[in-house]
Amino acid sequence: MSFTVAIVGRPNVGKSTLFNRLVGKKLALVDDTPGVTRDRRPGDARLMGLTFTIIDTAGLEEADEESLQGRMRAQTEAAIDEADLSLFVVDAKNGLTPVDTALAEMLRRRGKPVVLVANKSEARGSDSGFYDAYTLGLGEPTPISAEHGEGMLDLRDAIVEAIGKDRAYAKEDVAVTNVDISEAAGEGEDEDEEPLYDDTKPLRVAIVGRPNAGKSTLINRFLGEDRLLTGPEAGITRDSISVEWDWRGRTIKMFDTAGMRRKARVTEKLEKLSVADALRAIRFAETVVIVFDATIPFEKQDLQIVDLVLREGRAAVLAFNKWDMIEDRQAVLADLREKTDRLLPQARGIRAVPISGQTGWGLDKLMQSIIDTDRVWNKRISTAKLNRWLETQQIQHPPPAVSGRRIKLKYMTQVKARPPAFMISCTRSDALPESYTRYLINGLRADFDMPSVPIRIHFRSAENPFEGKKRRT
């Protein structure tokens, strides 16, 4: 992108609505509750021929540095320093407040270009608020309606004037993003070939878990900076925020998500939106790290989150966080491994890594587990190998007989990866018990080294070419 723009202003003036308008998607949560946005969220904006990076920020308020609002303010100030231009959004409908005046003074001290934006200008009675904005001393306000998309041409012209025409329309090579990845991964490849794993491809990783498990602290430790808002308060993260960094030459795109509580406890509309946003992050990710609090692991919600991730078909890795608070580590680790095997039978062989997001202990091992799990998630097995394996499995443990006739498994092939899915042609597929399916899945895990990822097997009844034809007499 040619330049970076930060959207700033006090809470509830419509910053996230404007952000969603500029990126063309509902990426940021929007609600009437003030202070919905807490972390800074970047996005790729397009506006009437302009392309640039846009950063949504938390509402600026006067607050003590150590308070949650104070830490949110520090994140917003970091975005202002990072940006080339700030869009200072005020509420023309409800008018200015002393906070607006203080923020205008702060932006002037920064010495960077500012475009004053009078949002909600479509509302009745907004003229007074629009003209009051002149008193902020930041030039002529640009009237817009972020909700209805009005005034976008004027906003573009104001940005071009502030940043300069050459900078605004600078050409550069832009990498292709938002590529639609077909679920039929490997489609078009020879089914008897086993493609090599591409360890240079960017990897999407979602970090999920219960509130206050240390998800944001973990990502900050990976990045080596306080990029995400953290603190002792549970439920700080609301939006799913994505950040990028390199690990041993590979681009990693990580999604921090809101803590996921039991549905019965989620009553507020805003928290429901946050959890829905976390679910979208899980579906967009390739590998999901489920963060457990090692001091109170295997709560019911922990188990439900793991089950959700596997049902969504994602590769899963467990991270037992806060390991720096554990005293008898060997005994606790042995107990965690026993409980993992016993309480998560559907995730047999899942990789589980003790870590400390606070100190950074164990993070290299966690990253290697993420890469190894993604490798398995992308695995493809040749049809020839699968059918030799299927024959051996039936010899060792034949399928059951139905009405005196044994079910025959005739042919097997892998129909997709991400996660691995297989199709078996057989007789009487409707009569094959679930226990035999589990036997085959466990065999695939053991014989083809496929731990920790969902494996799906679909059965298709082999057609009888003589069915329905009259017998000769």
From Swiss-Prot:
Entry superkingdom: Bacteria
Binding residues for GTP 1: 9-16, 56-60, 119-122
UniProt entry keywords in alphabetical sequence: GTP-binding, Nucleotide-binding, Repeat, Ribosome biogenesis
InterPro entries in UniProt: G_ENGA (IPR031166), GTP-bd (IPR006073), GTPase_Der (IPR016484), KH_dom-like (IPR032859), KH_dom-like_a/b (IPR015946), P-loop_NTPase (IPR027417), Small_GTP-bd (IPR005225)
Keyword field contains Glycoprotein: no
Gene Ontology molecular function, alphabetical: GTP binding
GO biological process: ribosome biogenesis
Domain (KH-like) ranges: 379-463
Keyword check for GTP-binding: yes
Domain annotation EngA-type G: ranges: 3-167, 203-378
PANTHER family on file: GTPASE DER
UniProt subunit comment: Associates with the 50S ribosomal subunit.
Family recorded in the similarity comment: Belongs to the TRAFAC class TrmE-Era-EngA-EngB-Septin-like GTPase superfamily. EngA (Der) GTPase family.
Name of this chain's protein: GTPase Der
Gene name, Swiss-Prot/TrEMBL: der
